[in-house]
From Swiss-Prot:
Gene designation per UniProt: ribH
Organism: Geotalea daltonii (strain DSM 22248 / JCM 15807 / FRC-32)
Binding site for 5-amino-6-(D-ribitylamino)uracil: 23, 57-59, 81-83, 114
Protein's name according to its UniProt entry: 6,7-dimethyl-8-ribityllumazine synthase
Catalytic activity of the protein: (2S)-2-hydroxy-3-oxobutyl phosphate + 5-amino-6-(D-ribitylamino)uracil = 6,7-dimethyl-8-(1-D-ribityl)lumazine + phosphate + 2 H2O + H(+)
One Pfam assignment: DMRL_synthase
Length: 155
């Protein structure tokens, strides 16, 4: 019979870094509230949570890299919103942020949960930040908890 390794949804004793972009802050702050709610509900001590605010989504990957390099965190949660406008700026920012965050996770070995919304409209972002479509900040924190515990089980 194979051994199955799964992460549990228990944040007790885990340390989390959260990075949130200030651009579109009305969305970012709701995502942050959702992430903090998930962490605390699942046993995280607020003393083991550090939040870094960056100017916008484009700065998230570098801040994630700096956090991961400290070795202080069991998982990092990235939050923000990139909303499509009339120019191709959205395409460049959304692609680079997602690639940058993925590279940090792969290069550092630290679990990084991607909670940066990439939406076509403000309404879609609002829906994903705590209304119709749930709160992706909450979901990202759940991913961070589970993955951090999974990694502890892989020896």
């Amino acid at each position: 019979m194979p051994k199955f390794i799964e992460g549990k949804l228990d944040a007790k004793g885990l340390r989390f870094g959260i990075i949130v972009g200030r651009f579109n802050s009305f969305i970012g702050e709701r995502l942050l509230e959702g992430a903090l709610d998930a962490l605390i509900r699942h046993g995280a001590d607020d003393k083991n949570i550090e939040v870094a605010r960056v100017p916008g989504a484009f700065e998230i990957p570098l801040a994630t890299k700096k956090m991961a390099a400290t070795g202080k965190y069991d998982a990092i949660i990235c939050l923000g919103a990139v909303i499509r406008g009339a120019t191709p700026h959205f395409d460049y920012v959304a692609a680079e942020v997602s690639k940058g965050v993925a590279h940090v996770s792969l290069d550092s070995g630290v679990p990084v949960a991607f909670g940066v919304l990439t939406t076509d409209t403000i309404e879609q972002a609002v829906e994903r930040a705590g209304t119709k479509a749930g709160n992706k900040g909450f979901d990202s924190a759940m991913t961070a908890i589970e993955t951090a515990n999974l990694f502890k089980g892989i020896k």
